[in-house]
């Protein structure tokens, strides 16, 4: 037999009007904020990932693969200069 912790049950919480008033505002707000974060391109700037049109440039159409084991730093420098 378990004792009572004095907390409200989950069923009481999700059936209360106050819960739905608060969450009917916060859930759509989070969705809209996430959509704006991605659609404005701010997510690309914050995380440093290239935009879809920046993966392949006019001069570099191939995939930047590191092929040499001992000259990998030179290849990385060459790839970073091409950006």
Curated annotation (Swiss-Prot):
Full protein name: Cytochrome b559 subunit alpha
Localisation: Plastid, Chloroplast thylakoid membrane
Co-factor remark: With its partner (PsbF) binds heme. PSII binds additional chlorophylls, carotenoids and specific lipids.
Family statement drawn from the similarity comment of this UniProt entry: Belongs to the PsbE/PsbF family.
One Gene Ontology term, aspect cellular component: photosystem II reaction center
Cofactor(s) needed for function: heme b
Quaternary assembly: Heterodimer of an alpha subunit and a beta subunit. PSII is composed of 1 copy each of membrane proteins PsbA, PsbB, PsbC, PsbD, PsbE, PsbF, PsbH, PsbI, PsbJ, PsbK, PsbL, PsbM, PsbT, PsbX, PsbY, PsbZ, Psb30/Ycf12, at least 3 peripheral proteins of the oxygen-evolving complex and a large number of cofactors. It forms dimeric complexes.
InterPro entries: PSII_cyt_b559_asu (IPR006217), PSII_cyt_b559_asu_sf (IPR037025), PSII_cyt_b559_CS (IPR006216), PSII_cyt_b559_N (IPR013081), PSII_cytb559_asu_lum (IPR013082)
UniProt-listed HAMAP family: PSII_PsbE
Gene of this entry: psbE
Example GO molecular function: heme binding
Function: This b-type cytochrome is tightly associated with the reaction center of photosystem II (PSII). PSII is a light-driven water:plastoquinone oxidoreductase that uses light energy to abstract electrons from H(2)O, generating O(2) and a proton gradient subsequently used for ATP formation. It consists of a core antenna complex that captures photons, and an electron transfer chain that converts photonic excitation into a charge separation.
Annotated transmembrane regions: 21-35
Membrane topology category: Single-pass membrane protein
Lineage: Eukaryota, Viridiplantae, Streptophyta, Embryophyta, Tracheophyta
Entry keyword set: Chloroplast, Electron transport, Heme, Iron, Membrane, Metal-binding, Photosynthesis, Photosystem II, Plastid, Thylakoid, Transmembrane, Transmembrane helix, Transport
Organism: Pisum sativum
Binding sites annotated in the UniProt record for heme: 23
GO BP annotations, alphabetical order: photosynthetic electron transport chain
């Amino acid at each position: 037999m378990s004792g009572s912790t004095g907390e409200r049950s989950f069923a009481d919480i999700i059936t209360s009007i106050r819960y739905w008033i608060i969450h009917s505002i916060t859930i759509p707000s989070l969705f809209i904020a996430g959509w704006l974060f991605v659609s404005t391109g701010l997510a690309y700037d914050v995380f440093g990932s290239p935009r879809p049109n920046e993966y392949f440039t006019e001069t570099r159409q191939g995939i930047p693969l590191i092929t040499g084991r001992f000259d990998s730093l030179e290849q990385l420098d060459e790839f970073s200069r091409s950006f």
